[in-house]
Curated annotation (Swiss-Prot):
InterPro entries: Diketo_gul_Rdtase, Mal/L-sulf/L-lact_DH-like_ah, Mal/L-sulf/L-lact_DH-like_NADP, Mal/L-sulfo/L-lacto_DH-like_sf, Malate/L-lactate_DH-like. Its EC number is 1.1.1.130. Catalyzes the reduction of 2,3-diketo-L-gulonate in the presence of NADH, to form 3-keto-L-gulonate. Pfam families: Ldh_2. Its main location: cytoplasm. It catalyses: 3-dehydro-L-gulonate + NAD(+) = 2,3-dioxo-L-gulonate + NADH + H(+); 3-dehydro-L-gulonate + NADP(+) = 2,3-dioxo-L-gulonate + NADPH + H(+). It is found in: Cytoplasm. The gene is dlgD. It comes from Salmonella paratyphi B (strain ATCC BAA-1250 / SPB7). GO terms for cellular component: cytoplasm. Belongs to the LDH2/MDH2 oxidoreductase family. DlgD subfamily. NAD(+) binds at residues 168-174, 224-225, 304-306. This is 2,3-diketo-L-gulonate reductase. The active site is at 44 (proton donor). Keywords: Cytoplasm, NAD, Oxidoreductase.
Amino acid sequence: MKVTFEELKGAFYRVLRSRNIAEDTADECAEMFARTTESGVYSHGVNRFPRFIQQLDNGDIIPDAKPQRVTSLGAIEQWDAKRAIGNLTAKKMMDRAIELASDHGIGLVALRNANHWMRGGSYGWQAAEKGYIGICWTNSIAVMPPWGAKECRIGTNPLIVAIPSTPITMVDMSMSMFSYGMLEVNRLAGRELPVDGGFDDNGQLTKEPGVIEKNRRILPMGYWKGSGLSIVLDMIATLLSNGSSVAEVTQENSDEYGVSQIFIAIEVDKLIDGATRDAKLQRIMDFITTAERADDNVAIRLPGHEFTKLLDDNRRHGITIDDSVWAKIQAL
């Protein structure tokens, strides 16, 4: 089925207000969920909303909490999220990193006691739209086996890097081959994964999303490389925020909350003039996209460039929502 942006935001707002969320908070949160979905990231927008409400109802999320700055060291700040709403807090933290970068050239905000930020790419994009390089990542509950293990002991720990090119170039990737949200998207669509995404119950690589969702043996991105990167991202976020590691979140909490996150903004224009910046970025993009194609029918893509088209299509033709997901939201 298809819905308009206003219908989608209205559905989110209704559910949030039914939980006695303050009007301005409910409006901003509903806006962010709707914008994420409109951008084509269904896995962390509309599909994730029922899970968000579950955590809200369980008390994992404290909707009226106010994040508090704990430490200030010039270009670096440490904040405590107080388990406030994840996407609203993350937006505020990247805004703060941008403010610090405008003063120092670079700004870094380390956040503890945070909740799931939904679409991490929103915050990298937020920085790039203002002309900054945006880098951010989060740890999580243990949902992935380290390389060589069967048990989940590391997080998917998504990493975002956004560049202020035209259009914006952005990598938004979990440390697994696919996020659990994308496993759900493919399962709901009745599709196999395009490449192996995890192991089946016999320890063989599989493209079946439902099998991986059930046994939790998701495949690290780049095998041992993604496993290693997940571990060091967790260590950095934990140390800089003085917050919880994947081990602590997993062993001490009843669900995924109280995570640690990093937000970095870099003001490129303090280091290079605008014309030179644009020319260098365009040369990089042209050099890549003019390579001889392996398949004439498949274009060479740059990361993140598809979001501009997805957003335009959804604004023109309406936002496609899975019927079962829409039914869940209507029942909340």
